[in-house]
């Protein structure tokens, strides 16, 4: 039997067909369908453009048979920054797309994708100095040298020795 299909409309007005079981990886969409039922009308996704929405749907399609997320109680999974190989390849995108995927996953309440996106950013930061992190994310240092010294002294206890 064919899987029912929904239509998402991206913020830039593009209609994208999505299998219902794929769409329901989004807790937001799943709850909406449970509350309102399926109307056959396109579902507007106002905060997500076509390119990002297609990436999110690609991830959801790959993970559609994963067990549902159990919520925040799985501490061991959250504490690791390990990412499976498919997800690592999926997240090999430019920084702007990576951050857009994270924002979309948060908006659509797709916990697994949000975790993978955040772990990807964590791995980009891991082991880097503040200067290297600023360079990676193109962040301007707005501290004076005196302020920076004071912050280093106040946080000496947290430094790796």
Swiss-Prot record:
GO terms for cellular component: CBF3 complex; kinetochore; nuclear SCF ubiquitin ligase complex; RAVE complex; single-stranded DNA-dependent ATP-dependent DNA helicase complex. One of its GO terms (biological process) is G1/S transition of mitotic cell cycle. GO terms for molecular function: DNA replication origin binding; ubiquitin protein ligase activity. It comes from the Eukaryota. Pfam families: Skp1, Skp1_POZ. The keyword Transmembrane does not apply. Residues 102-161 are annotated as: Interaction with the F-box domain of F-box proteins. The keyword Cell membrane does not apply. InterPro entries: SKP1 (IPR016897), SKP1-like (IPR001232), SKP1-like_dim_sf (IPR036296), SKP1/BTB/POZ_sf (IPR011333), Skp1_comp_dimer (IPR016072), Skp1_comp_POZ (IPR016073). Keywords: Ubl conjugation pathway. Pathway: Protein modification; protein ubiquitination. Belongs to the SKP1 family. PANTHER family: SKP1. Essential component of the SCF (SKP1-CUL1-F-box protein) E3 ubiquitin ligase complexes, which mediate the ubiquitination and subsequent proteasomal degradation of target proteins. Controls sulfur metabolite repression, probably by mediating the inactivation or degradation of the metR transcription factor. Component of the SCF (SKP1-CUL1-F-box protein) E3 ubiquitin ligase complexes. This is E3 ubiquitin ligase complex SCF subunit sconC.
């Amino acid at each position: 039997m064919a899987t029912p299909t929904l239509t998402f409309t991206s913020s830039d007005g593009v209609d994208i067909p999505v299998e219902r079981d794929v769409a329901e990886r989004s807790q937001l969409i799943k709850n909406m369908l449970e509350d309102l039922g399926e109307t056959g009308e396109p579902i507007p996704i106002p905060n997500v453009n076509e390119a990002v929405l297609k990436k999110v749907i690609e991830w959801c399609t790959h993970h559609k048979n994963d067990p549902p997320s159990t919520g925040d109680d799985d501490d061991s999974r959250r504490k690791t920054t390990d990412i499976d190989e498919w997800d690592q390849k999926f997240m090999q995108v430019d920084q702007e797309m990576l951050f857009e995927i994270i924002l979309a996953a948060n908006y659509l309440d797709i916990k697994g994708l949000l975790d993978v996106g955040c772990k990807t950013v964590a791995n980009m930061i891991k082991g880097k100095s503040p200067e290297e992190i600023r360079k990676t994310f193109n962040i301007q240092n707005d501290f004076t040298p005196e302020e920076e010294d004071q912050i280093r002294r106040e946080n000496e206890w947290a430094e790796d020795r």
